[in-house]
């Protein structure tokens, strides 16, 4: 059995779990997420805990039970608490402005960048150089943050660009004469 799958997922109060024929549906105050069921993994729901067991002793079934447990754990946390990613813009003239589901970025290019948020992700800009992304799906929030960072990744000489809050950018030394 997978080491990850050995620990059951505790379902907090206010989170509803439904078993369908093809998917596990998790509902909470932040929305609803579904997880497609895999034939190698059996899911048991007892006393507010979700347990994941491999249907057979193959390597793939063990791996899938651990993967399923990790994904469902993130879904339970997402619908109850939500996920947040913070980005900061470092550089002269680098600006961000949120207007509903649209993020306008000025990153030193000759044109502004207009990024439309996907379903389930909301954006806020507390200041012109800070972006806060929130949502219930961890994968989608992380993907959006990575796409925004990719517009102007931090460069190694001055550190200018879009970076995650707390990210350490390894700086290079300038060429010596």
Curated annotation (Swiss-Prot):
The keyword Methyltransferase does not apply. GO terms for cellular component: cytosolic large ribosomal subunit. Belongs to the universal ribosomal protein uL6 family. Part of the 50S ribosomal subunit. One of its GO terms (biological process) is cytoplasmic translation. GO terms for molecular function: rRNA binding; structural constituent of ribosome. Transmembrane segments: none annotated. It holds the Pfam family Ribosomal_L6. This is Large ribosomal subunit protein uL6. Keywords: Ribonucleoprotein, Ribosomal protein, RNA-binding, rRNA-binding. Disulfide bonds: none annotated. It comes from Neisseria meningitidis serogroup C / serotype 2a (strain ATCC 700532 / DSM 15464 / FAM18).
């Amino acid at each position: 059995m997978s080491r990850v799958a050995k620990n059951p997922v505790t379902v907090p109060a206010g989170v509803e779990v439904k078993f369908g024929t093809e998917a596990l549906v998790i509902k909470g105050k932040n929305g609803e997420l579904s997880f497609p069921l895999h034939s190698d993994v059996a899911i048991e729901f007892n006393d507010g805990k979700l347990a994941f067991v491999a249907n057979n002793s193959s390597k793939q079934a063990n791996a899938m039970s651990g993967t399923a447990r990790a994904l469902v754990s993130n879904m339970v946390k997402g619908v109850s608490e939500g996920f947040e990613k913070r980005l900061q813009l470092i550089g002269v003239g680098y600006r961000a402005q949120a207007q509903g589901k649209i993020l306008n970025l000025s990153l030193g290019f000759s044109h502004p960048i207009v990024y439309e948020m996907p379903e389930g992700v909301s954006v806020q800009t507390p200041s012109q150089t800070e972006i806060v992304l929130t949502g219930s799906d961890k994968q989608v929030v992380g993907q959006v943050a990575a796409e925004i960072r990719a517009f102007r990744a931090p460069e190694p000489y001055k550190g200018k660009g879009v970076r995650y809050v707390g990210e350490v950018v390894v700086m290079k030394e300038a060429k010596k004469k």
